[in-house]
Amino acid sequence: MSKLNKTILADFEAAQIQRQLPEFNQGDTVVVNVKVKEGNRERVQAYEGVVIGTKNAGLNSAFTVRKISHGFGVERVFQTHSAIIDSVEVKRRGKVRAGKLYYLRGLEGKAARIKEDLAAAAQAKAARQAAAKAE
């Protein structure tokens, strides 16, 4: 690809990346509000689970959320800059050491729990309070 095409592509991607989602990592419990179209009406559906992996690739960035629904593990891959994502809310910060948490697929019940990262949660809370004071 020529240098001109690369710069045009980079400019296009920068213009498309407008959404500012909260910072989250693997192990965090998040609620992803997804726009669902049913017939001619549109509604927002919440999908809550643990982030088991992220892929950071500019406009093609994605993250995978896993939840247990009726005893079965369900994973869903969301494109970070997709228009169907209404919002993302971080419920709980997890303390993990691995980059991808695929090992959770083989665990059940209490073994699949993730320890909470209290330091990161306190830091996020302080940042929210500082932002509220600034307004």
From Swiss-Prot:
<comment type="similarity">
    <text>Belongs to the bacterial ribosomal protein bL19 family.</text>
</comment>
<keyword id="KW-0689">Ribosomal protein</keyword>
<dbReference type="GO" id="GO:0003735">
    <property type="term" value="F:structural constituent of ribosome"/>
</dbReference>
<dbReference type="GO" id="GO:0022625">
    <property type="term" value="C:cytosolic large ribosomal subunit"/>
</dbReference>
<dbReference type="InterPro" id="IPR008991">
    <property type="entry name" value="Translation_prot_SH3-like_sf"/>
</dbReference>
<dbReference type="InterPro" id="IPR038657">
    <property type="entry name" value="Ribosomal_bL19_sf"/>
</dbReference>
<dbReference type="InterPro" id="IPR018257">
    <property type="entry name" value="Ribosomal_bL19_CS"/>
</dbReference>
<keyword id="KW-0687">Ribonucleoprotein</keyword>
<dbReference type="GO" id="GO:0006412">
    <property type="term" value="P:translation"/>
</dbReference>
<protein>
    <recommendedName>
        <fullName>Large ribosomal subunit protein bL19</fullName>
    </recommendedName>
</protein>
<dbReference type="Pfam" id="PF01245">
    <property type="entry name" value="Ribosomal_L19"/>
</dbReference>
<comment type="function">
    <text>This protein is located at the 30S-50S ribosomal subunit interface and may play a role in the structure and function of the aminoacyl-tRNA binding site.</text>
</comment>
<dbReference type="InterPro" id="IPR001857">
    <property type="entry name" value="Ribosomal_bL19"/>
</dbReference>
